[in-house]
Amino acid sequence: MFNILSRVCRSSSFHGFLRSSGYPRFGASFRGISMLNDLNNSANYQSKKRVGRGPASGLGKTSGRGHKGSGQRRGRRIKPGFEGGQTPITKLFPKVGHSTGHLKKPLRLGLGRVQEWIDRGRLDASKTITMKDLLDSRCCRGIKHGVELTADEPGLLKTAISIEVSKATVQAIQQIKNAGGSITTVYFSPLALRAHLHPSSFRTPPRPPLPVSKKDIRYYTNPHFAGYLANVKNIRELYYGDQRFPYEPIVKDK
């Protein structure tokens, strides 16, 4: 209905009728007639709370704050969790459960994507594939805490590859071995990983680190996870021997 009235008001015949009937012309064009501007819904508006204006309002004198205390003072801010001095609920009960959000998790990479990159010729399966090769070929991006190989659907990996990553699932290791390949999981510290991915940033490469935590030592010495320390006979000698960090320094030409 409002649309019909607005069209009538904007029509030229309606303007001619106004001129012929003697009604004053208020402009070259007329705005559409609408009752929406006259609607009033007082429930959607809350009146301003006026305090300190006498006892009749109920908010005079202390303005609804009461007598003395932190609530009466200026700035009256109470820290979240404060319960007036009694033991807060955050301290009443022991901590339950745990969270793994703070752990440094490696980047997960599926074997299907590795096979796809080999089929495209972006990865060379004739040599050992390292995490630097995966980064340079854009097979995976943003390597911050290493790479973990995961198993996709069985049968996706058809090429025998030799790959070296930080971690791998048992299913991924089994699929690589079924395809006739080999895999080695190697421990990298943050410094060693940065030197491995970006060797041009180092004048002399850092010493290859050894796992320190008990969890990492158990992982990389376990042949079930293809750890690179699984074939080491004397782990203690590896950690405390004189040949702990054998490496050849690279000196750039001046």
UniProtKB/Swiss-Prot annotation:
It comes from the Eukaryota. The keyword Signal does not apply. It is found in: Mitochondrion. Residues 64-79 have a biased composition (Basic residues). GO terms for biological process: mitochondrial translation. Keywords: Mitochondrion, Ribonucleoprotein, Ribosomal protein, Transit peptide. One of its GO terms (cellular component) is mitochondrial large ribosomal subunit. Residues 1-78 form a transit peptide. Pfam families: Ribosomal_L27A. InterPro entries: Ribosomal_uL15, Ribosomal_uL15/eL18, Ribosomal_uL15/eL18_sf, Ribosomal_uL15_bac-type. The keyword DNA repair does not apply. Residues 44-104 are annotated as: Disordered. GO terms for molecular function: structural constituent of ribosome. Component of the mitochondrial ribosome (mitoribosome), a dedicated translation machinery responsible for the synthesis of mitochondrial genome-encoded proteins, including at least some of the essential transmembrane subunits of the mitochondrial respiratory chain. The mitoribosomes are attached to the mitochondrial inner membrane and translation products are cotranslationally integrated into the membrane. HAMAP family: Ribosomal_uL15 (MF_01341). Belongs to the universal ribosomal protein uL15 family. Component of the mitochondrial large ribosomal subunit (mt-LSU). Mature yeast 74S mitochondrial ribosomes consist of a small (37S) and a large (54S) subunit. The 37S small subunit contains a 15S ribosomal RNA (15S mt-rRNA) and at least 32 different proteins. The 54S large subunit contains a 21S rRNA (21S mt-rRNA) and at least 45 different proteins. This is Large ribosomal subunit protein uL15m. It comes from Schizosaccharomyces pombe (strain 972 / ATCC 24843) (Fission yeast). The lineage of its organism: Eukaryota, Fungi, Dikarya, Ascomycota, Taphrinomycotina.
